[in-house]
Amino acid sequence: MKYALKIIHKAQKDLDSIKGKDFNFIKKKILSLSSNPRPFGCNKLIQEEGYRIRAGNFRVLYRINDFEKQVIIYRVKHRKQSYR
């Protein structure tokens, strides 16, 4: 069953600052989450609720609401910033 994608305002600002090939690759990864919100290679976050997937040099941070069938994207960060 497909999940609805919801992008929080901060994540949208993060995406707006990314250009070119990186943006297209991240967009493709985010869209794939609607059919499989827990793909191979996703990591469950330890310090906060949610998951992380790699998209090149960027990390997409998101939460899954199985009850409402939603994937909520809350941050898209460069890998250097996401591990701080």
Each predicted region: which residue ranges?
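Enriched for short, Lys/Arg-rich terminal
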Residues: 2-24, 55-58, 63-84
